[in-house]
Amino acid sequence: MSRYTDMFTRLDEAGEGAFVPFIMLNDPSPEDSFQIISTAIEAGADALELGVPFSDPVADGPTVAESHLRALDGGSTVDSCLALIARVREAYPEIPIGMLIYGNVPFTRGLDKFYREFAEAGADSILLPDVPVREGAPFIQAAEGAGIDPIFIAPAQASETTLEGVSAASKGYIYAISRDGVTGTERESSTTGLTDVVDNIKRFGGAPILLGFGISSPKHVADAIAAGAAGAITGSAITKIIASHCEGEHPNPSTITDPEGLRKELTEFISAMKAATKKQ
């Protein structure tokens, strides 16, 4: 069984959904990033979604876009991201590790090499937010050849054809977005209609559904679980916490000014978000 299957089975038996934080790798440095990831896991994260910094993150709002920039200002490369994933995998052998990476990266490295490298580092799944499922065939083939679960986004207003394609192609989980647009707590998730979003995808079968985009509070998590999702992904809210403890001006590297304060704030936030996954 895959790590995702193990996780969803365990959580289902416990009457819980999954809480999955999105964290940008190397923001603001590799060592800081490892400590942030460790804090998230120890505070209750069930799985990880890790970003690889990119210079033109079109699917991200301002908060996450700035985290790409901080990591790049600190010298982040794809190779340093792979090294950090391997370090996380060695420290936490059971946790599912999902990647969020823009499509230019696999094109630059070559599809087969790209998926093989991330599999060898310890990643379980890869989502390319700028690659729709209708263009996914070569990525799916390369991912499955390397033992990586391909993940696709199910947009809130997707056509029947898209939802059917996403449900068939996504392994591990399906990333359903609670509203269309870019990531971020700048626009909070609308909890009205979440059940319709989830039910619409479930009609086609497929992997468990994780809801993302604009999920920034325990209530949003609880609403996602109540709507029938298997869990929720939170990114911008966590990235904002990290940013509030960083000091530095682009293009210079940023530093974390209060590591203990950051650890405490992240722990409190993630613990509260995880507590909201308990099914009523």
Swiss-Prot record:
- UniProt pathway annotation: Amino-acid biosynthesis; L-tryptophan biosynthesis; L-tryptophan from chorismate: step 5/5
Alphabetical list of PROSITE patterns matching this protein = TRP_SYNTHASE_ALPHA (PS00167)
Q: Which Pfam families match?
A: Trp_syntA (PF00290)
**What GO molecular function annotation could you give as one example from this UniProt entry?**
tryptophan synthase activity
A Gene Ontology cellular-component term: cytosol
Q: Does the keyword Metal-binding apply?
A: no
| EC nos | 4.2.1.20
Keywords noted in UniProt: Amino-acid biosynthesis, Aromatic amino acid biosynthesis, Lyase, Tryptophan biosynthesis
Q: Which reaction does it catalyse?
A: (1S,2R)-1-C-(indol-3-yl)glycerol 3-phosphate + L-serine = D-glyceraldehyde 3-phosphate + L-tryptophan + H2O
Enzyme type, top EC level: lyase
Q: Which InterPro entries match?
A: Aldolase_TIM (IPR013785), RibuloseP-bd_barrel (IPR011060), Trp_synthase_alpha_AS (IPR018204), Trp_synthase_suA (IPR002028)
Locate the active site: E49, D60
Family annotation (HAMAP family): Trp_synth_alpha (MF_00131)
Describe the subunit structure: Tetramer of two alpha and two beta chains.
What family does this belong to? Belongs to the TrpA family.
According to its UniProt entry, the function of this protein is described as:
The alpha subunit is responsible for the aldol cleavage of indoleglycerol phosphate to indole and glyceraldehyde 3-phosphate.
Name of the protein in its database record: Tryptophan synthase alpha chain
